[in-house]
Amino acid sequence: MRVARSAAGTDTGRKRRRNEDSFICEPPLFAVADGMGGAQAGEVASSLAAAALREGEATASSGEEGVVEMIRGANRRVHHRAQTDASASGMGTTMTVAIVSSADTVTIGHVGDSRAYRLRNGELEQLTDDHSLVAELVRRGELSPAEAEVHPQRSVITRALGTDADVDVDAFSVEAVAGDVFLLCSDGLTTMLDAETIARVLGRNLGDLDAAARALIAAANERGGEDNITTVLFDVADVDDIEQTLEIPALAVAGFDEEDTLHPEDGVRLPPELLAAFVAPGSETAVLSPRPMARMALSALLIALLAGLIVVLVARGLAR
């Protein structure tokens, strides 16, 4: 299993003066962090946590243990800054992380009330449990979900990065099947939109995840936009569905002889200087794969390949 598409968006909202959210959308690593603290401390906390997470990915173990290790490393980074910088005293951040493995699973790590969801066959499932006061009261049966949504302390969280030297991290793995769409988001989205609305907006925009991210943010702002809003989206597909051989129909170019015609069944036969840029040694068929192309979109590769091919063919035709 591999990430097929990904997109992200963030917005200050309609009530806040600055955006204290940070996010990572760098397959196979995805994350959302919602900072808190006076002045610019919240923004600093979330950005520090995101930076530490990126650094920790390179050396962390695999699976749930690795995700916990990464998040605890981010916690230490934020806590150290809060203890040594008077202007950052009391700062903290939520953190929700998703890492896509090749074993048909997505590993989630979670601290705070930023959430992870999975959309499968039109059904939206909340994967994480909020670490918040009202969520705890709901779990104890002291509040109903409806009461929690309007409770005056609904934004009070019970866990965060940076507030203590260590932190409890919830980590687990979920199954991923082709077509699943995963959403990570800050509470600026979920306090404005219920699960039914989120599922409906996603369902209308599944063909374009960039549009889906923008649509979710716009919907939250339409409902009031009381907080910063961040969305990170990705979907997964089987590796065989992503890696594919690129076949280009024969092209007619001025000055090109019949014997030079490109035959689709043979793949694309390119001049050596162009071939080397797109295919593995020993192959004459261009195979596009997200891994060697450093996550470049397949559509952009196709355009670049066609443009380069046409230039070479025209140049050869004019030279005759």
Each predicted region: which residue ranges?
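PP2C/PPM-type serine/threonine phosphatase catalytic domain
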Residues: 1-320
